[in-house]
Each structure stands twice: as structure tokens, then as C-alpha cells.
Curated annotation (Swiss-Prot):
It comes from the Bacteria. Coiled coil: none annotated. Belongs to the FAD-dependent oxidoreductase family. Pfam families: Pyr_redox_2, Rbx_binding. Its cofactor is FAD. It catalyses: 2 reduced [nitric oxide reductase rubredoxin domain] + NAD(+) + H(+) = 2 oxidized [nitric oxide reductase rubredoxin domain] + NADH. SUPFAM superfamilies: FAD/NAD(P)-binding domain. It comes from Escherichia coli O157:H7. InterPro entries: FAD-bd_OxRdtase, FAD/NAD-bd_sf, FAD/NAD-binding_dom, NO_rdtase_NorW, Rbx-bd. The keyword Acetylation does not apply. This is Nitric oxide reductase FlRd-NAD(+) reductase. The gene is norW.
Length: 377
């Protein structure tokens, strides 16, 4: 490979891929191009920065220069890729272009901001860069509105509350974590958030935001409004597919790849939050780690399919942490819920009484690995 491998992106997926390639080949040319600083940080830490009083710069684990030196890479930080010429195998930015033998898209996903009037007043916390842009406003805010009661919204609501802020969480759904589990399972965390002082506005809709002399006026449905100092959008992520689309690749929700992480173009692969693997978008650390291991082998000439086991998803709400696995969002499961003072075990079974999903909390999270072994893959 005279031109080697070019990777667009510098997040967890890109870094895992680099580490796995270098374990097998110390000299193949590797080039990383990304729009950010390329410094390494742990993205899940963003859910806890406010209660821990961390600044954006405190999150940096390794600088881009240290990373390049350690793994023998060419890095191009603060560089926007504008185009991919798939036929000529060339990646282009405004001032530069790179030939590749193999190209990997690790462009991640961007935070979805609801299209309401005043949406520009909403903050997002999907990267170190985004946190850096708003850390002073968030630190100074007394009253915070979080839009979205999913995994990230619930984590942030607890964190801001632990930092002593007045927190309101709004969601269209009737319960928190509604896309992940039924209300009878999420109710334990919901009660805990309420006990802590989080004001939950469920089955409610944000209609607009407006700057005022004393903060931001949030207009809700049913002629309601509240005034806050900061509004955070936590309404989910959208895979970054614009570059792939311009390159003529097949796109659905994400960049479509097969079990080999290969796109509709034989020399282009996708990995991480931007990828849709056989119809599934899996924006969690474990599938990305496993995907990176397989893709490294395939880029170096192997033909290894990705086989994902049953995997745990961790909800980082320290006052009431949860682990879940399996098809927790399935509507047809019967839930058997065992609740004790020290925690909960909720098992979702199908009509044949086969375990299909589970959620465990607090001290009973230690039962997760035993349950995981009994889930069908």
C-alpha cells in the first residue's frame, strides 16, 4: 500500500482502529484528518463534568502530537474534508488533498437540535469542543432546561442536579428512557430523579426559546412557559453522512456497511457512530471496540466478519446506575421485575419464556454478567 490508509475522524472509533492496526503493522502509512484538535478525551466523561467541576481542558488525556508520535501517524487537525473522489481515491480539503489505498470514515454523529424558534440558544454536549464553547455559561447557570429524557438527558439531569442547579427535564414521552425500556422498568430511576429535585415535564413539548433580560424564556405546549439560564439539547444523535453521500455511498440512517465494515465502495469503510452495520446503528463503546479490531484485520488483507455478542449498555447515573442488555425496547416482552432496597432486576421474556432482555440497577448490577450469558446472540 503505497498511499496507505486514510482515516477521517479522531474520536474513539478512529483511535481504536489506529491502535489495532499498529498492533499488527508498525509501518503501513496512516493518515488521520479531522475538524477538531485531535486531542484524546473520554467522551462519556461529558455526562459528569459539571458536578465534578471539570473544565474542557481537564478532559484531555493525550495531545494530538503525543498520539502521532506514539503510533507513527500523519495528523491533520482543524481540517475540514470537503469531498471524496471515490473513483480517483482522493480525499480533498480546501487547501490539501490525500491519495489513499483504503479510506475509513469515522466521522461520528452530531447532536440533533429540535427545529423550534430560538433553536440557536440551545447548547449541545456531544464533544470536548462543544463543552469548551459553553462551559462558562453552564457553570454560571442556576436554572437549566434539558430537552430529551433519553440516556444522555437522564445522565445530564442527574449531574446538573448533583451540582446544585435547578433542573427541568422535558420530553414528549410519558416516561424517561422511553426508547430503551418500558415505563415499569425506568420508573425506579425516574422516582430517584424526582426525589433529587429534578422537575420532570413528561408528555410535554418545547415550542420555542427567546432571550430575555434575565435568561431564556422557554415556551411549552398548553400555554406554559419557564425561564432558565441555559438549555441543553439531548434529543439524540444523527450519524454524520454528508461526506459519504457526496462520495456516492449507500446511506440509510448511517453509512451502510456489511459485516466486514465495508461500504458500497470496495475501498471505503465506515466505523463508529456514523456507521450502520447490517441495518443497525450502535453508538456504544463495546461494539465500536469490536468493530475496530475486525476492521484493522480487514484493512491489512484479512476477510474477518464482525460477530457481536450480547452486550451491556451502562447508564451513568451515579445515584442510581443501570446496566441493560438485549432487546429492551421490544414491545412484546413480558417483564418480571424484582425490586429490593439494594437494587432491581428486570427480566424481559418472550412468549416461549426465553430471556430476551434485562435491566439491573445499583448493587444488583453484579448479576448482569450471569444474565448476559443466557441471552441469545
Amino acid at each position: 500500500m503505497s498511499n496507505g490508509i486514510v482515516i477521517i475522524g479522531s474520536g474513539f472509533a478512529a483511535r481504536q482502529l489506529v491502535k489495532n492496526i499498529r498492533k499488527q503493522d508498525a509501518s503501513i502509512p496512516l493518515t488521520l484528518i479531522a475538524a477538531d484538535s485531535m486531542d484524546e478525551y473520554n467522551k462519556p466523561d461529558l455526562s459528569h463534568v459539571i458536578s465534578q467541576g471539570q473544565r474542557a481542558d481537564d478532559l484531555t488525556r493525550q495531545t494530538a502530537g503525543e498520539f502521532a508520535e506514539q503510533f507513527n501517524l500523519l495528523l491533520f487537525p482543524q481540517t475540514w474534508v470537503t469531498d471524496i473522489d471515490a473513483e480517483a481515491r482522493v480525499v480533498k480539503s480546501q487547501n490539501n488533498q490525500w491519495q489513499y489505498d483504503k479510506l475509513v470514515l469515522a466521522t461520528g454523529a452530531s447532536a440533533f437540535v429540535p427545529p423550534v424558534p430560538g433553536r440557536e440558544l440551545m447548547l449541545t454536549l456531544n464533544s470536548q469542543q462543544e463543552y469548551r464553547a459553553c462551559e462558562t455559561q453552564l457553570r454560571d447557570a442556576r436554572r437549566v432546561l434539558i430537552v430529551g429524557g433519553g440516556l444522555i438527558g437522564s445522565e445530564l439531569a442527574m449531574d446538573f442536579c448533583r451540582a446544585g442547579k435547578m433542573v427541568t427535564l422535558i420530553d414528549n414521552a410519558a416516561s424517561i428512557l422511553a426508547s430503551l425500556m418500558p415505563p415499569e422498568v425506568s420508573s425506579r430511576l425516574q422516582h430517584r430523579l424526582t426525589e433529587m429535585g429534578v422537575h420532570l415535564l413528561l408528555k410535554s413539548q418545547l415550542q420555542g426559546l427567546e432571550k430575555t433580560d434575565s435568561g431564556i424564556l422557554a415556551t411549552l405546549d398548553h400555554q406554559r412557559s419557564i425561564e432558565v439560564d441555559a438549555v441543553i439539547a439531548a434529543t439524540g444523535l444523527r450519524p454524520e453522512t454528508a461526506l459519504a453521500r457526496r462520495a456516492g455511498l449507500t446511506i440509510n440512517r448511517g453509512v451502510c456497511v456489511d459485516s466486514y465494515l465495508q461500504t458500497s465502495n470496495a475501498d471505503i469503510y465506515a466505523l463508529g457512530d456514523c456507521a450502520e452495520i447490517n441495518g443497525q446503528v450502535l453508538p456504544f463503546l463495546q461494539p465500536i471496540q469490536l468493530s475496530a479490531m475486525v476492521l484493522a484485520k480487514n484493512l491489512l488483507g484479512n476477510n474477518t466478519p464482525l460477530k457481536l455478542p450480547a452486550m451491556l449498555v451502562k447508564i451513568k447515573t451515579p445515584e442510581l446506575p443501570l446496566h441493560l442488555a438485549g432487546e429492551t425496547q421490544r414491545q412484546d416482552l413480558r417483564w418480571q421485575i424484582n425490586t429490593e432496597r439494594q437494587g432491581m432486576v428486570a427480566r424481559g421474556v418472550d412468549d416461549a419464556d426465553q430471556l430476551r432482555a434485562f435491566v439491573v440497577s445499583e448493587d444488583r448490577m453484579k448479576e448482569a454478567f450471569g444474565l448476559l450469558k443466557t441471552l441469545p446472540v
